[in-house]
Amino acid sequence: SVGFKAGVKDYKLTYYTPDYQTKDTDILAAFRVTPQPGVPPEEAGAAVAAESSTGTWTTVWTDGLTSLDRYKGRCYHIEPVAGEESQFIAYVAYPLDLFEEGSVTNMFTSIVGNVFGFKALRALRLEDLRIPNAYVKTFQGPPHGIQVERDKLNKYGRPLLGCTIKPKLGLSAKNYGRAVYECLRGGLDFTKDDENVNSQPFMRWRDRFLFCAEALYKAQAETGEIKGHYLNATAGTCEEMIKRAVFARELGVPIVMHDYLTGGFTANTSLAHYCRDNGLLLHIHRAMHAVIDRQKNHGMHFRVLAKALRLSGGDHIHSGTVVGKLEGEREITLGFVDLLRDDFVEKDRSRGIYFTQDWVSLPGVLPVASGGIHVWHMPALTEIFGDDSVLQFGGGTLGHPWGNAPGAVANRVALEACVQARNEGRDLASEGNQIIREASKWSPELAAACEVWKE
C-alpha cells in the first residue's frame, strides 16, 4: 500500500491548532473571515492558514519530503466579531522561514497572494500583521526618519506645512514652477507633485524638475528657510524611476516622491535604498489604497499597508485627515499614525491594533494629513497629529482669493498661532475657532481665508 492516504483533505485537522504557543519569531496575522454558509469557522480559519502557507487542496507525495510541522501556517485562535453575523477574526501564525529577508513583496505574496479568491470564503480581510523583531531587522526601513528629517530641514517643534500644486494636470513646467515658488515664498515648507504627475506630453519630468528646483532655491534665498518640493519620480520602469531620482539629486533638491502601491513594493524599496545612500528624503503617496482597503469585510486594512511601507521605506506617507473630505475614523487613524511614528506600539483593539508591535529602532515615518482641509481645521489637526506630521493644504492654499502666496501665509500664520496657543496651555479642541479668529486680526491673509472657508 502507498505510504500516504490520497484524497481531498479536511484542513482543520492539520492547520487549526488552538493550543499552539506563538513564537517570538512568528509573523502573526489577524484575518476577518466571512465563511460561506455551512462552512464552520475552524475550517475557514484553517483554510486561510493552509492556503497562505504550505497547503494544497489534496494530499501530495512530496509532503513526505519536508517537515510540515516546521513550515506550516497555523490558525491558533478564532473569535466571533461582535455585532456581525457569521464574521470571525482568525489569528494565523507563520514560521519566519517561509519569508525572504528584506522583501515586503515576498511577505505579501505569501500572506495575501492567493487566499483571497478561496471558494470556502465569502470574504476575507487582513486586519493587522505582527512583524517579529528578527524580520524587521532585515529591512532598511525609511531612508532617514523623523529626527534626521528635522535636522536636515532645521525645523522643530511644529508640524510641517505642504501643498499639492493644482490644477494637477495641464500646467506647463514654467507655470508649475511659478506656483511652487509662490507657495514656498508665502511660508510653506513643502509643495508637492500630484500623484498622477509623472511625465506627460504637456510637461515632461526633466523640465518640471528644473523649474521646481529653481523655484525652491529662489524661495530659500528670500525666506532664509529650507524648502522642498516633492518631485514625483514614479515611472513606468524601475530604471526610469531611478534615473529621475538621480537627476533630482544632481539638482541638489532635498526630497523626491513615489506612489508606492501603483509603483509596487520592489520599486519602492529600491528607491528607498537609493534615497538613503544619497541623502534624499522620500515622500510616499498612497494612490490606489482605497481599492485595497475601502471595503470593511474584504481586502486589507490600511494599517497593514502602512506597516509594509515602514519596512519598505518612506519618510512621509499620506494617512487620512480625520477632519477633511476623505473618510477615516479618528481612533483607528490615530492607531496607524502611532504605528508609523513610534518605536513600540501596544496592542489596543479599540484603535484597531491587534498586536503589540516593536519596531526595534527602525526610523519612523511622518504621517501626512491631506485632502479637503483648510485654516479652520488647523487647531484640530495640530491637536490630533501633534508636531510630527505634515499638514497638506492643496485647495486650502491655492483657493485663497488673493492667490497662492497669501494662501500660504494664511496657513502658516494659523499653524504658528495654534502651536503657540498649545504651548501656552490652551485647549485647541474647545478654543480652536477663537484662536484662529484672534490670529486673523493680525493677518489680513488669514482673515480673507477665514471668510472663504466658513467654519
Swiss-Prot record:
Keywords in alphabetical order: Calvin cycle, Carbon dioxide fixation, Chloroplast, Disulfide bond, Lyase, Magnesium, Metal-binding, Methylation, Monooxygenase, Oxidoreductase, Photorespiration, Photosynthesis, Plastid
Essential cofactor(s): Mg(2+)
Active-site feature positions: K166 (proton acceptor), H285 (proton acceptor)
Gene Ontology BP term (one): reductive pentose-phosphate cycle
GO cellular component: chloroplast
Record flagged with keyword Transferase: no
Name of the protein in its database record: Ribulose bisphosphate carboxylase large chain
Assembly and oligomerization: Heterohexadecamer of 8 large chains and 8 small chains; disulfide-linked. The disulfide link is formed within the large subunit homodimers.
EC number: 4.1.1.39
Positions annotated to bind Mg(2+): K192, D194, E195
Chain sites annotated for binding substrate: N114, T164, K168, R286, H318, S370
Organism the protein comes from: Lupinus albescens
Family according to the record: Belongs to the RuBisCO large chain family. Type I subfamily.
Catalytic EC class: lyase
UniProt PTM comment: The disulfide bond which can form in the large chain dimeric partners within the hexadecamer appears to be associated with oxidative stress and protein turnover.
MF-aspect GO terms: magnesium ion binding; monooxygenase activity; ribulose-bisphosphate carboxylase activity
NCBIfam families per the UniProt record, alphabetical: PRK04208.1
Modified residues (N6,N6,N6-trimethyllysine): K5
Reaction(s) catalysed by this chain's protein: 2 (2R)-3-phosphoglycerate + 2 H(+) = D-ribulose 1,5-bisphosphate + CO2 + H2O; D-ribulose 1,5-bisphosphate + O2 = 2-phosphoglycolate + (2R)-3-phosphoglycerate + 2 H(+)
Keyword Transferase: no
SUPFAM superfamilies in the cross-refs: RuBisCo, C-terminal domain (SSF51649), RuBisCO, large subunit, small (N-terminal) domain (SSF54966)
